[in-house]
Design a protein with these regions (language model features):
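Short, surface-exposed amphipathic charged segments that create phosphate/polyanion-binding patches used
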Residues: 25-30, 143-146, 197
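Residue-level preference for long, well-ordered alpha-helices that form the structural scaffold
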Residues: 20, 54, 83, 178-179
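Mid-to-C-terminal alpha-helical segments outside catalytic/metal-binding sites
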Residues: 30, 150-153, 163-198
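Mid-domain alpha/beta scaffold segments of enzyme catalytic cores
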Residues: 1-56, 64, 126-127, 191
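Catalytic pocket-lining loop regions of alpha/beta-barrel enzymes
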Residues: 35-39, 48-155
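Conserved, mostly hydrophobic/aromatic
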Residues: 31, 40, 65, 107, ...
Length: 198
C-alpha cells in the first residue's frame, strides 16, 4: 500500500496469540526484511485474552525487534478492555530488559500520565505519543515534561480518524511547547526513532 506513496511509511501489526510465537516472529522478519516496514505494532491489551506489556509471551517479539533494529509500538490508551491493561508499570520491565529497543507508546498510557512520564524519565528508550489525549485533563503534563527532560522522547500523533490531522497540527503548535523542542516533537524525534534517514 505504501510503495507508490514514498511520503508514507508502513508499520506492521502482529498478534502472537493468533499466529503463535514462531509465526509472529516469522511475520516480523518478513515485515521488516522483505516489506521494509519501519516498526512493529503490538496491542497486548486488546488480545484474547488481554495481556500486559510485560507478559512473557511478548518477550520473544521484543527480542527479535531489538535484533532487527526496529521499534516496537504499543497501544496504550483508555479504550482497552480493562483499565488494568493501560497501567504503564509493566512497561518499565520491558524497557529495562531491552535497553536498546525503542518503545513507542501510542496514546501515551493515558490516563496514567504522571506514571508513564516517571517511567520515561527512568528509561530513555520509551517514547510517548499522547496524540488526542494531550488535549484532555492532565495532558498538560506531557507538554511540561517535553519542555524539560522528555524533549527527545515525545512524538506527535493525531489519532486520526478520531481527530482531524490539520486541526491537530494547529492545536499542537498552540500547546506551549518551547521553540527549542517543537521541531523535535513534530518530526525530528520520529525521524530518529523510525530511522527514516537511514
Amino acid at each position: 500500500l505504501t510503495a507508490p506513496h514514498p511520503q508514507l511509511i508502513a508499520i506492521g501489526s502482529i498478534d502472537p496469540q493468533t499466529r503463535g510465537i514462531k509465526g509472529a516472529i516469522a511475520e516480523i522478519e518478513r515485515a521488516v526484511k522483505q516489506l521494509g516496514m519501519k516498526a512493529i505494532n503490538l496491542e497486548p491489551g486488546f488480545g484474547s485474552p488481554p495481556l500486559k506489556a510485560d507478559d512473557a509471551l511478548l518477550f520473544p517479539l521484543y527480542d527479535v525487534c531489538d535484533q532487527l533494529g526496529v521499534p516496537v509500538c504499543l497501544m496504550s490508551g483508555p479504550t482497552s478492555p480493562a483499565l488494568e491493561f493501560t497501567d504503564p508499570a509493566p512497561l518499565a520491565r520491558v524497557a529495562r530488559a531491552f535497553p536498546r529497543l525503542p518503545i513507542v507508546c501510542y496514546h501515551g498510557f493515558y490516563p496514567y500520565v504522571n506514571e508513564v512520564i516517571g517511567i520515561a524519565f527512568r528509561y530513555e528508550n520509551i517514547h510517548l505519543v499522547p496524540d488526542m489525549y494531550i488535549f484532555l485533563p492532565g495532558g498538560n503534563y506531557y507538554v511540561e515534561a517535553a519542555n524539560g527532560f522528555l524533549a527527545d522522547q515525545l512524538l506527535f500523533g493525531t489519532s486520526y480518524p478520531f481527530r482531524a490531522m490539520g486541526q491537530t497540527v494547529e492545536d499542537y503548535l498552540r500547546l506551549g511547547f518551547r521553540d527549542a523542542v517543537i521541531e523535535r516533537i513534530m518530526h525530528g524525534n520520529a525521524e530518529r526513532v523510525l530511522r527514516l534517514g537511514v
